[in-house]
Amino acid sequence: MSQWNIAAAQYAGQHHSVDDHVAHHLRFVAKAAQQRCDLLVFPELSLTGPGKTDLLPPPDDAQLAPLLAAAKRYRITIIAGLPLDLNGQRVKGLALFSPSRHSILRYPQGSGASLVPGDKQLTIVDTHADSPNLDPQATLFTSCQSVGDTRWRQSINTLQRFAHRYAIAVLMANARGGSALWDEKGQLIVRADKGELLLTGSLGRQGWQGDIIPLG
């Protein structure tokens, strides 16, 4: 792949139904497709919202089918956040919509995910482990978040150190603003302010380049 185009969706939809969340996601997907993105990453629990007290029920595949169709139509891999029922517990999870798969893959959110350009699956990473289980071929680590200023500052410091220590680019999609991309040296490439937008990154022969694309 001569150039890899990625984007973080700074998505903060306040909807009461999964269908409305999906429709809102599709606006971001269409905008990312206009930018010729190969990968689009949404924040934590983007498909349901956080819920007032407990995590909401996980959406079923039929509710999410429009996103899988969009992944195939635009040839774009989509990672979105949703609740997941795992071993009798409801936890934060990720949904992977791949243009080369006929079904939706679901994973526990963990601390994030690493992936290889063009691959059909994610490797969920525990950044708190002594030696994170990063795929040695991975080019990018993604972090889906929905944090305010105090936790955001903690997150960006942690992710920048992670990028430098493990020599991997890091893309953070944060619902509340400040989404960012660091290169494999831990250097900040681009960081967003608040509001709904796409934060994009392109990996080519000259390294990473970044931009901010308004949603409207």
What do these predicted ranges mean?
Residues 18, 22-100, 149-168:
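Cys-nucleophile CN-hydrolase/nitrilase-fold catalytic domain and related Cys-dependent amidase chemistry
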Residues 80-82, 93-96, 114-115, 178-182, ...:
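Short beta-strand scaffold segments in enzyme catalytic cores
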Residues 85-137, 148-149, 154-157, 195, ...:
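Active-site catalytic loop in hydrolytic enzyme cores
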